[in-house]
Amino acid sequence: MPDAFPFDNTYASLPDRFFTRMSPKPVAEPGLIAVNRPLAERLGITLGESDAELAQLFAGNVVPMGAAPLAQVYAGHQFGGWSQQLGDGRAVMLGEVVAPDGARFDVQLKGAGQTPYSRMGDGRAWLGPVLREYIVSEAMAALGIPTTRALAAVTTGEIVLREARMPGAVLTRVAASHIRVGTFQYFAARQDVDALQALLDHTIARHYPDVDGPSGLLDAALQAQADLIAKWMGVGFIHGVMNTDNMTLSGETIDYGPCAFMDTYEANKVFSSIDQFGRYAYAQQPQIAAWNLAQLATALLPLMPDRDAAIEEFTEAVNGFAARFDTAWHGVLRAKLGLVSEQEGDAQLAFDLLNRMEQGGGDFTQVFRALSGPEPERAAEAFAAPAVLAPWLKAWRARLARDNVAKAARIASMQADNPALIPRNHRIEEVIQAAVKGDFAPFERLTTALQDPFTDRPEFADLQATPARSEAVTQTFCGT
């Protein structure tokens, strides 16, 4: 059966200044690494069985029928500095598919060759970042966190030059859309009100059909990002490059370049090698989200009839982000601690635990997972200094007693909110190093394990473990 994509391309019907129409650049000798057949089925995409043909498809050598390939343009603030034109420098969107349930998704090839937005880059991707995004985006989906997805990964049979000669690869990314804060900024900076209005109408129709106008879209984006960042922080996730061009209007996580998950808890933890001043540190993520959303609000101002009134309205809305985030974050923390009701002092109880983790070298994931078990006192084993936990445990147990929830119910609830397994940085690095040598078995094992992160499985105990000091990853790289 030939490959079939249920394309219905609405972004391609926007004015030409939104994108450049172009096809992916063919590669020499594509080879299939992985294809996500459950996701393909979810999207209503019919795929053949031939690995060779799938490799040609997902490398961009064959463009599927009904596609309308294009590279999108956008702008953005990168580490606070304004870039008036960015865009898809190495990605080509094949088009939009409409899934059997009516949901609409973009299908994009990353590493598809040079575009008009490549800015001196070669338009290609190397194997490491492709595997990292495949692993982490699929792990995030399994964790229940809004995210882009990975449909396929292929090698290209070509070498790309980075810090060394690296094997090339292409990732097929699926997203609710690729509309970014930076997309709005691009047209606002050019005072292109007609394009801004078209983008607003398109975004609302696609993501928030029940809201009205710029105010409604801003409100929806504020809530979506408050919920998203709280979920990130609930699994110790650090995005690492929260530029405005990496914030979606859909509320999905996008662009996994230097991302990482904390092992030992540190509020101001930074992994990204390019984040020299800690702008995007773990605890800074809510403040940066608010800053980015203020840029969205600014970009929407030209669409408001009364600019002065709009500035006042939007300022109040953005200033309200902190309260939205606190509500979402406190809800995440209560669930992680098994607290059913909302009571005064809950947030302080949670923050006290985090402080003790930081003081005592507690592994973020393992501490919460152990608290979810039948012997929560074993959470002390996940600390370098176990004694710091005992006073907190006493206070937590007293708080649990006030909810009067059966132990079995509490355990089940907490284990559904506290994963046993996350994609630990050192395990991802091991996968990449093996794959560069042609061994994809570790990649297959890790991706299989991460499909079910809330279940303890002895066969994956090594993947759950805190890294030894010699294994710990202290810095991550964009790799673009």
From Swiss-Prot:
One Pfam family in the UniProt entry: SelO
Chain positions recorded as Mg(2+) binding sites: 246, 255
Enzyme Commission numbers on file: 2.7.7.-, 2.7.7.108
Reactions catalysed according to its record: L-seryl-[protein] + ATP = 3-O-(5'-adenylyl)-L-seryl-[protein] + diphosphate; L-threonyl-[protein] + ATP = 3-O-(5'-adenylyl)-L-threonyl-[protein] + diphosphate; L-tyrosyl-[protein] + ATP = O-(5'-adenylyl)-L-tyrosyl-[protein] + diphosphate; L-histidyl-[protein] + UTP = N(tele)-(5'-uridylyl)-L-histidyl-[protein] + diphosphate
The protein's name in its UniProt record: Protein nucleotidyltransferase YdiU
InterPro entries listed in its UniProt record: SelO (IPR003846)
Residues given in the record as ATP binding sites: 87, 89-90, 110, 122-123, 173, 180, 255
Keywords carried by this UniProt record: ATP-binding, Magnesium, Manganese, Metal-binding, Nucleotide-binding, Nucleotidyltransferase, Transferase
Organism: Jannaschia sp. (strain CCS1)
